[in-house]
Swiss-Prot record:
It comes from Scaphirhynchus platorynchus. Its cofactor is heme b. PANTHER family: CYTOCHROME B (PTHR19271:SF16). It is a multi-pass membrane protein. The lineage of its organism: Eukaryota, Metazoa, Chordata, Craniata, Vertebrata. It is found in: Mitochondrion inner membrane. Heme b b562 binds at residue 48. This is Cytochrome b.
């Protein structure tokens, strides 16, 4: 599920980026353009927004499973996972702000 969410996020993000304008005066109108004029643009935008939440739910379940089964005893693997979790959170924050 985690991989499926990640692939969905990447694909919908690419489709949204094709129609998005980052200029400060036209950013809002480009989002309105995506929702109104692009075929299934409203669906792509909603899948991208809700897919991010589902991705983090799956990620937290994965961490909880690791804690339940004692995977934290494998120090190197656990530390790499923590670094990846923090990088994912930072990336999501930057994506949300931008």
């Amino acid at each position: 599920l985690l991989g499926l969410c990640l692939i969905t996020q990447i694909l919908t993000g690419l489709f949204l980026a094709m129609h998005y304008t980052a200029d400060i005066s036209t950013a809002f109108s480009s989002v309105a353009h995506i929702c109104r004029d692009v075929n299934y643009g409203w669906l792509i935008r909603n899948v991208h927004a809700n897919g991010a939440s589902f991705f983090f739910i799956c990620l937290y379940l994965h961490v909880a499973r690791g804690m339940y089964y004692g995977s934290y005893l494998q120090k190197e693997t656990w530390n790499i996972g923590v670094v990846l979790l923090l990088l994912t959170m930072m990336t999501a924050f930057v994506g949300y702000v931008l």
